[in-house]
Amino acid sequence: MQSLPVPKVPECLAYQNRASRPETDSKAGFQSGRRSEPCRRLLPSELMINSQPFGRTGHHSTRVIFGAAALATMRQDRADQVLDTVLAGGLNHIDTAASYGDSELRLAPFLADHRAEFFLATKTDGRTGDAARAQLERSLTRLGVDQVDLIQLHNLVEPDEWETAHAPGGAVEAMAKARDEGLVRAIGVTGHGTRIADMHLASLERFDFDSVLLPYNFLMLQNPDYRSSVEQLLEVCAKREVAVQTIKSIARRRWTPDSTKPHYAWYEPLPEGEPLERGVAYVLSNPQLFLNTSSDATLLEATIAAAQGDHVAPSDAEVQADVSALDMMPLFDGAELERI
């Protein structure tokens, strides 16, 4: 397995230690402070994040993919700091979406200097061909690029939307045409909830997608129906060389009404330390999977640090102890808690 070295952290990334950071930018989801001392984690130049083929695309992606939803509401200066962390951490794959607020706009200045270094993915939630094409063209303009490496049909889980997207004149047909025109290199499909693995299986029967994306964590896989569907999906993807991206690896639960913590993601993430490290290891111990980082950018350094090297899956007892201690709950239950 090819590995990419983590470069030495640039001076522009240096911060004071956590205890002395004076303020948090609530819109940015990234803590600010005097940039004078070394960054907490990303120092040892010998650290590595493993990379592997991203399906049959021909690209070796780091197994941790930057989830650029984190940039959705950030000012440009905060976004630049986060992207410095992405660069210093050795990541080489960015995943954004047309619906992620200002994310594509915040990426544009970075891509002007670093486009060739990154596999760039975005998403469209257009279901008709015209809507998907218009959104793709808008994304290319906002990103400041002529081509994306991967366009994904975003959250394709509802049956009526699925039928529209796959029908003649639908989004799938339009994105295939965009691929023929050189606007995209590959086409994927994404989604949330307990039905999404089954929907991805149906999508792969209808069209030869290059990648899928879905939730994957210990609690989600305690649902026997979801686990069975995920196992079937992974088997199909392995046979067909379809890349499998995972989200919600460090999810703790949905926010409770009485929570006073800053809400940088729509769900409450695991805290830094061993629980987060076990969440990362649970995903990366499966060599087939890629891990897309949380929209909470304050946890990006911790996630990158936890992802170094090879991984052994935590025991069920260890994760169950986290579930009990942290009062963890599944984000999706197939009923009332099925939508984000």
Predicted regions and their residues:
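N-terminal binding-site loop/beta-alpha segment at the start of enzyme catalytic domains
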Residues: 41-118, 174
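Beta/alpha (TIM)-barrel catalytic core signal, keyed to glycine-rich beta->alpha loops juxtaposed to Asp/Glu
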Residues: 102, 156-340
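Short, acidic/polar
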Residues: 74-86, 130-143, 195-203, 276-279
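Intrinsic-disorder-associated, low-complexity terminal segments enriched in Asp/Asn/His/Tyr and depleted
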Residues: 15-17, 25
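Active-site mouth loops of central-metabolism enzymes
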Residues: 67-77, 122-130, 265-271
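Active-site groove signature of glycoside hydrolases
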Residues: 143-162
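Conserved, mostly hydrophobic/aromatic
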Residues: 54, 66, 94, 107, ...
